[in-house]
Amino acid sequence: MPRTDNDSWDLATSVGATATMVAAARAIATNADNPLIADRFAEPLVRAVGVDFFTRWVTGDLVVADVDDTESGWQLAQMPDAMAVRARFFDAFFQDATRAGVRQAVILASGLDARAYRLDWPAGMTVFEIDQPEVIAFKTTTLAGLGAVPRADLRTVAVDLRQDWPKALTEAGFDAGRPTAWIAEGLFGYLPPEAQDRLLDNITALSATGSRLACEAIPNRPQQDAEKARELMRKATARWREHGFELEFGDLGYEGDRADVELYLQNLGWQSVGTQMSQLLADNGAAPIPHNNDSVTMADTIYYSSVLTA
């Protein structure tokens, strides 16, 4: 079902289900023979959500070779390594920020992110998680049931990012006078282009000099390439739906030309370094994801680490 301005979701539907899919990929990566990450909360969270397709994927009952369309450029088989190196990128970002003295972090659209529970945070660290109320409530309750305890001062902020989240964040104790480490992981594609700009504007307005931001973006492509990408994605998910997958990824994102993230941030006073997914995979010894001259694939995603210097 296409997105609407005021749509909402839980972790089994719409945009929320993509967070569960990513957590499933992290769970598989964690259980690999030579794991690139260790996210012990990923599998129990996926099981608790209860989407059969993702549960079978995590347990190995889903045979990926039977599900994937190898010509589409979007394959389940690629996701565990891709999401593992993505997680490592954002983990390292937080570790670098805390080593630099940052003691305040904000995880935007936190989904099933368990970093507040699994990373080694320094004393005095405050972590804010922002997401839809149903998502926040489910994860908090489930992790408490598992006996998990946050390793930092965790403040959950149950608000839609399309609402006045800066106000809600401030009311939760956020201090705009202190440097902050922000992450927007797997978020921009689910925002309209103008909302992406507004989010970056709001982050900047709330950030003291020395704040840091990590995010990801898919490069703009000509309209015909975007249409080709949607066609290939629908081809991939059509195969998945034969095995119980119920999402149509092509309906979850927003179309339209987006600002170049690095240039947009530069104009706001941020200095950025971008690393392509293909490079992250190579740096971590993971199998490459082929580029597709006719379309965008996961290999084209760029991961930015930025510092506010103005």
UniProtKB/Swiss-Prot annotation:
- What organism is the protein native to? Mycobacterium ulcerans (strain Agy99)
Name the EC number(s): 2.1.1.-
Task: Give the keywords, sorted.
Answer: Methyltransferase, S-adenosyl-L-methionine, Transferase
Q: Pfam families in the record, alphabetically?
A: LCM
Q: What Gene3D superfamilies does the entry give?
A: Vaccinia Virus protein VP39 (3.40.50.150)
- Give the function comment from the record: Exhibits S-adenosyl-L-methionine-dependent methyltransferase activity.
The Swiss-Prot or TrEMBL record annotates one GO molecular function as:
methyltransferase activity
Q: Which family does it belong to?
A: Belongs to the UPF0677 family.
Q: What is the protein's name according to its record? A: Putative S-adenosyl-L-methionine-dependent methyltransferase MUL_2766
Among the GO biological process terms of this entry, one is:
methylation
